[in-house]
Design a protein with these regions (language model features):
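Short hydrophobic beta-strand micro-motif common in sensory/regulatory domains
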Residues: 114-121
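Short beta-strand-to-loop transition segments that serve as allosteric relay/switch motifs
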Residues: 128-138, 143, 159
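Allosteric cytosolic regulatory segments
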Residues: 145-156
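Intrinsically disordered, low-complexity terminal regulatory regions
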Residues: 1-69, 222-236
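Signal-transducing coiled-coil/dimerization helices and immediately adjacent hinge/linker segments
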Residues: 164-236
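Regulatory sensory and allosteric helical modules in signal-transduction proteins
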Residues: 43, 59-98, 105-113
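Signal-transducing alpha-helical linker
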Residues: 6, 156-164, 179
């Protein structure tokens, strides 16, 4: 990726599409930026968290892992408002390696060796993060880094098209991630009713259960929705 104007046109075309804008941005990152996979996660100040889209199953697992654990490059990028670049997850001298113990274990199991997270923001408001991963260690070069920053800006435009965070609810129409949001949102509401807690507390309980069982958040949410799992008072 060495033609910034051409890259900008590709991203603009993705944002202009009538559906799956976020997924198209992820796919373009894989095609053009020399990475194995890409994903976009929603993390807002109102408490919305979820996987918007992912280019493949591994990317989806990495996104879900960070949402479930509340740690990882995506979370740090959103909190700091700055890119988090880890070109070698096996490098013990990288401070991030010690900062995300649970994420590191899951990423290693998934075969991820490098991760790069870019905050998706509009001004001072954070919407989430664009995450890129590689199956082999290696830093992004200057062109790739610049391209990723442009992709994060495009992701912000795509999410704004969906009115992300409006009303404190997950928006409809999040492309391939819509089923994820619908299931997690429904499960959160069911746990909220079962225990008489706030939406934020109910979502935290879902995350805690997924972490304790070593399962994806979506799997636990599906069990709740399909009534295979019910939260009781002792779970509070």
């Amino acid at each position: 990726m060495n033609d910034r104007d051409a890259w900008a046109r590709l991203l603009a075309g993705a944002v202009a599409e009538r559906s799956d804008q976020s997924r198209r941005i992820c796919d373009l990152c894989v095609e053009m930026l020399g990475v194995t996979g890409a994903g976009i996660s929603l993390v807002t100040a109102s408490g919305n968290r979820g996987v918007v889209c992912a280019s493949d199953d591994v990317a989806a697992r990495i996104e879900d892992l960070q949402i479930t654990l509340g740690e990882g490059p995506c979370v740090d990028a959103v909190r700091s408002g700055a890119p988090v670049l880890v070109p070698d997850l096996d490098n013990p001298e990288d401070v991030a390696v010690g900062r995300w113990p649970a994420f590191m274990e899951g990423a290693g199991t998934a075969g991820v060796r490098a991760v790069f997270a870019f905050p998706v923001r509009v001004g001072a408001a954070g919407l989430g993060a664009l995450d890129l991963y590689r199956a082999s260690a290696g830093a992004l070069d200057g062109d790739q880094l610049g391209g990723a920053l442009m992709a994060a800006d495009a992701a912000a435009l795509a999410l704004l098209e969906l009115d992300v965070g409006a009303g404190g609810a997950f928006p409809d129409g999040l492309g391939t991630g819509s089923a994820y949001h619908s299931q997690v949102h429904q499960a959160t509401g069911m746990v909220q009713v079962q225990l008489g807690v706030t939406t934020k507390e109910a979502f935290a309980m879902l995350r805690a259960r997924a972490f304790a069982q070593g399962r994806p958040l979506l799997g636990v949410a599906t069990d709740v929705v399909e009534r295979r799992l019910r939260f009781a008072a002792e779970d509070r």
